[in-house]
């Protein structure tokens, strides 16, 4: 049977994507982000240059800017993804490279542990120097407890943004999903603020990021609840109850779920007053525990690592489940397959009718002889020679 181009493409196995997801996460864990020449940093510089040309205090101009940035990166990624389909080694390599480029688990955990060490030494100046690499808050306004809370909240939110969400979109859409998601998330980090400059211009980027993270944030909360007994011995049910109660109270439709899950799992209370670029925001409390301490940062990192492993396994299983469905579909004969087989048989019979008629005549004659033997039982008393004659 000859398959159409679209059908052949849909039947390509996706196990190279699964292999690439595993290899990319392993690469990030082993070598982390490069100090120079990181692809995301290069995109950030290009987006900043484009913003300087496109900026206007307008939602429409901001939406055009966000769309142009996403398309400029996602279109080549889609072409590369299409080119490597049907070439498993190359597809696995390109997916692994993309996963390594867009995930940031190692950097997140490393910076959080640096802040934890500084706070445990009571070196507030060193902790304030680390904080800008984790969040956009003004470190000068924070004391030790405020910085501990800021780091725990950053670990919770970025576990979703920098780990779970890229893996989710990589499992769903391969290289284009990975690259497009990181583009949207980077734009949100650059212009998605409620400041006077970006309130209108950054609106589209912020909404795109909300949509892209809606499912991953809830997956992160569920995985945090599942991993909580391993790290903090907290009941998953109690974590989910806090997420259900407090997650929607956060200004962000996604970050609140992740922060509420970490707060419940760690037994701390998150939320409060934050200062972003001179703008003060007061957020509701998440969780029922005490105020975070430096030691809670270390526990948050352990929990984030457990969620990273779980999210990788879940993404790989989701991709392989698609391959299993493809295998079952290819084994099961479809209506098209049956119709094609019948058409082939009919064409063969039409092309060479004489042997078929002879074969049918021979079968009819044999059937007639057998019926005659059954209707004339005198052969039972005849000689062996007569019996042979009847069969002939």
Across the structure, where does each feature detected by a protein language model lie?
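Intrinsic low-complexity, disordered N-terminal segments enriched in polar/charged/small residues
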Residues: 368, 379-381
